[in-house]
Regions:
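FIC/Doc superfamily catalytic core
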Residues: 1-238
């Protein structure tokens, strides 16, 4: 991994290195059955938080609802694709959006939208696909691959929300895809928490002005929570 500090501050170690060490310690120590159970719990937790963050509170009480099932299928597709080493592409984005935001068919929007975040500059529909492709090219290029997962998340999340490729459900799709960047580097699925919503809004608005530091820290904490869930699973029955 790169020697790329998240916040240059006189030599303090970047959080990404500490997370890597915790993940490495778990390799070979967590029995396969426990790992599978822990991963499934993280998937379900990520979907629930995604739906809560986007106003679908009822899904928390009904894990067999079509909305929950669709989002869980979308997250499984994200995890499988990322873990196989494939790159994130427009086709995957559209399919994940279709699964997680019914009745959308995954179509790119054809009309202008009003911004829902301060400092956001929503694109005209004719620029959406080219701007999305530019973002993906950067994330999968040499610079993007040289970043810690939390740093890639902090670039992806606000830019996708600002591009807003769909008429609705952009935040939901952006949030589900955070797990692409964690799973691509061997981490489990991740999610923000509903209780963080107000703070996250402010951090996203700062990121529109290229101040991504707070979001990097936020996503580092999310990765830490996911690893902690695996560590707890490893301690079961010890």
């Amino acid at each position: 991994m790169p020697e790329l500090p998240i916040h240059p501050d006189g030599g303090r170690e970047a959080p990404g290195y500490a997370l890597e060490r915790r993940l490495t310690r778990l390799e070979g120590l967590l029995p396969a059955a426990r790992r599978r159970r822990a991963h499934q719990g993280l998937r379900e937790s990520s979907v629930l938080e995604t739906l809560r963050l986007t106003g679908a509170d009822a899904a928390e009480k009904d894990r067999e609802s079509p909305l929950f099932d669709g989002a869980l299928e979308a997250l499984a597709l994200i995890e499988t694709t990322a873990s196989s080493g494939k790159e994130l592409d427009l086709g995957l984005i559209r399919e994940v959006h279709r699964l997680s935001s019914p009745p959308s068919g995954g179509e790119i929007r054809t009309r202008d939208l009003a911004p829902q975040f301060q400092n956001a500059r929503i694109l005209s529909p004719r620029f959406i696909e080219s701007r999305l492709q530019n973002l993906l090219d950067w994330l999968h290029g040499d610079s993007g691959r040289g970043m810690f997962p939390a740093e890639r998340m902090a670039l992806w999340f606000p830019r996708f929300i600002e591009i807003a490729p769909f008429e609705r459900g952009n935040f939901r799709t952006a949030h589900l895809f955070l797990s692409f960047f964690s799973c691509a580097d061997g981490y489990p699925p991740v999610s923000l928490k509903f209780e963080e919503a107000e703070a996250v809004r402010g951090e996203v608005e700062r990121a529109f002005l290229f101040d991504t530091g707070p979001l990097v820290q936020r996503f580092s904490s999310a990765l830490g929570r996911a690893i902690e869930a695996l560590e707890s699973a490893g301690g079961e029955g010890a």
